[in-house]
From Swiss-Prot:
GO terms for molecular function: bis(5'-nucleosyl)-tetraphosphatase (symmetrical) activity. It comes from Buchnera aphidicola subsp. Acyrthosiphon pisum (strain Tuc7). Pfam families: Metallophos (PF00149). Coiled coil: none annotated. It is an enzyme of class 3 (hydrolase). Belongs to the Ap4A hydrolase family. This is Bis(5'-nucleosyl)-tetraphosphatase, symmetrical. Hydrolyzes diadenosine 5',5'''-P1,P4-tetraphosphate to yield ADP. Gene3D superfamilies: 3.60.21.10. Keywords: Hydrolase. Its EC number is 3.6.1.41. It catalyses: P(1),P(4)-bis(5'-adenosyl) tetraphosphate + H2O = 2 ADP + 2 H(+). The lineage of its organism: Bacteria, Pseudomonadati, Pseudomonadota, Gammaproteobacteria, Enterobacterales.
Length: 274
């Protein structure tokens, strides 16, 4: 039994399945942890989600910003843009069932025995592990609720970038969503920056990568995340594991087997990725 970590598949189904074959992933005994952004930009979002749905308890998923966008588009809250490649998914007779399954996925996975954490963008350096767990549960509860569309209408907000215990309920949810699915950089006081996507090679003070900020969590846990293809594995100290290698941008999909630390990769093949 092995555990594999991957992120940002982005509808690149062909590359994903080849990578699973390369790694000898066994869907009867192995486990797959995916750090979000299953869909969008690549041509086969529907096939990716259908396959993961078929794995049932063999897959552990945290949602990324593009997964949330798909749910919002399906609910009629956001426009279906051409670059999403969502048409096939939205027209599928399975779309409602698959969307409902996605809505019940997590924003944070924690394995206390192995001291492993996974989220899409990362973990706010302003949180300790207990606050992070509570905040994840709060947004998971809203997204899985029957009135999830109302939640999604209110959740997008760029100005909620600083954590305080006295945040009102809605702003608390907004901050949590920004932290788990959107942040890359922080300011020295801990405020999140959701806009800069560049490699740290090209970014100067006052911005710092979130994983270089002081944090009680990284002293205890190995942290797996995606969302940031321009990192290219550089500038990232242990115990952080960046998983987004930019497959949908014409680069590669990567996967780590936890037990022996072996990395697997598959170069971009799809012709419709953007």
């Amino acid at each position: 039994m092995s555990t594999y970590f991957i992120s940002d598949i982005h509808g690149c189904y062909e590359e994903f399945r080849i990578l699973l074959e390369k790694s000898s992933f066994n869907d009867k005994k192995d486990y797959l942890w995916i750090a979000g952004d299953l869909v969008s930009r690549g041509p086969d979002s529907l096939e990716v989600v259908k396959y993961l749905y078929s794995l049932k308890d063999r897959v552990q998923i945290v949602l990324g910003n593009h997964d949330i966008n798909l749910i919002a588009v399906h609910a009629g809250i956001k426009d279906n843009k051409k670059e999403n490649y969502f048409d096939e998914f939205l027209s599928s007779p399975d779309s409602v069932e698959l969307i409902n399954w996605l809505r019940c996925q997590s924003f944070l996975k924690v394995d206390e025995k192995r001291k492993i954490i996974m989220s899409h963008a990362g973990i706010s350096p302003q949180w300790d592990i207990n606050i992070a767990k509570v905040c994840a549960l709060e947004i998971e509860d809203r997204l899985s609720h029957k009135n999830y569309a109302l939640f999604l209408k209110e959740i997008y907000h760029n100005n909620i970038d600083f954590w305080r215990l006295d945040l009102n309920q809605l702003d608390r949810l907004r901050y949590s969503m920004n932290s788990f699915t959107r942040m890359r950089y922080c300011y020295p006081d801990g405020r999140l920056n959701m806009f800069c996507k560049k490699s740290p090679d090209f970014v100067k003070y006052p911005l710092r990568p979130w994983f270089l900020m002081p944090s009680s969590i990284s002293k205890v846990y190995s942290i797996f995340f995606g969302h940031w293809s321009s990192l290219k594995g550089t500038h990232v100290p242990k115990p952080f594991f960046p998983l987004d290698a930019g497959c949908c941008w014409g680069e590669e999909l990567v996967m780590l087997r936890w037990e022996d630390g072996k990395w697997f990769s598959q170069a971009y093949l799809s012709k419709k990725c953007i």
